Amino acid sequence: MTIDRTFPIFTVRWLAVHGLAVPTVSFLGSISAMQFIQR
């Protein structure tokens, strides 16, 4: 019962972290790529 109750919290936290980290990494990567192309 305890595992079933903590697992969804871990999943939501994992999805939230990746949901925020993936767009941030891609955004920073696109900015660095644009600056590199401009040079």
UniProtKB/Swiss-Prot annotation:
| Membrane-traversing stretches | 14-30
Cofactor: record remark: With its partner (PsbE) binds heme. PSII binds additional chlorophylls, carotenoids and specific lipids.
Report the superkingdom from the record.
Answer: Eukaryota
Q: Which Pfam families match?
A: Cytochrom_B559
Question: GO molecular function: any one?
Answer: iron ion binding
- Which protein family is it in? Belongs to the PsbE/PsbF family.
| Protein name, as recorded | Cytochrome b559 subunit beta
Recorded source organism is: Gunnera chilensis (Chilean rhubarb)
